[in-house]
C-alpha cells in the first residue's frame, strides 16, 4: 500500500469516529450523564454563593437539554463554615437549592470538623443536608477518579 492510500484510510477512520460515537449515544437513549465536584475551602459567603449558583445554573442547563447531572459540593478548611449549622452564611440558600436540585450532595470534611472542635472546645454541628466524609481532599480525589469534573469557584 502506498503512503497516499494509507493516509486516506487513516483520515477516513478519524473522520468516522464522531459519527460512531453519536450513534452509540443514540442507541443508549441519548441521555448524557454529567458529574460535577465543587470545592469550597474559604469562609467567604460570596464564594459559597457562587458554588450554589454554579450548581443551580448547571442543573438548569442540563435539565433543559434532557441530560442528568450529579453534583457534590465538598467543603473543608475554612470552607466548612458553609456546612456548619451554627455559622453558615448560606444555610437558607442550601435548603432552597435542595428543593430545586434534590440530587446535590454536600460533603463535610471530618478532619476539619475535628480540628475545629478541638480548637473551639465544643461539638461542631453540621447541617442535615450534609454528609460527613473522612477527608475533604480525599473525597475530591475519589470524585475525580469516578469521572467528576472539578470546579473551584
Model-assigned labels for residue ranges:
Residues 20-36, 43:
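C-terminal segment of N-terminal export signals and the immediately downstream linker at the start
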Residues 49-64:
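Histidine-anchored nucleotide/phosphate-binding helix
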Amino acid at each position: 500500500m502506498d503512503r497516499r492510500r494509507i493516509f486516506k484510510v487513516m483520515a477516513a477512520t478519524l473522520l468516522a469516529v464522531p459519527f460512531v460515537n453519536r450513534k452509540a449515544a443514540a442507541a443508549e437513549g441519548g441521555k448524557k450523564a454529567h458529574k460535577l465536584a465543587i470545592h469550597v475551602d474559604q469562609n467567604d459567603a460570596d464564594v459559597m454563593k457562587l458554588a450554589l449558583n454554579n450548581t443551580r445554573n448547571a442543573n438548569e442547563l442540563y435539565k433543559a437539554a434532557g441530560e442528568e447531572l450529579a453534583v457534590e459540593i465538598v467543603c473543608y478548611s475554612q470552607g466548612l463554615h458553609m456546612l456548619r449549622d451554627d455559622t453558615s452564611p448560606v444555610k437558607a440558600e442550601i435548603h432552597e437549592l435542595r428543593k430545586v436540585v434534590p440530587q446535590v450532595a454536600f460533603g463535610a470534611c471530618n478532619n476539619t470538623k475535628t480540628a475545629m472542635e478541638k480548637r473551639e472546645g465544643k461539638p461542631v454541628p453540621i447541617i442535615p443536608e450534609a454528609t460527613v466524609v473522612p477527608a475533604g481532599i480525599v473525597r475530591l480525589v475519589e470524585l475525580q477518579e469516578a469521572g467528576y469534573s472539578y470546579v473551584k469557584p
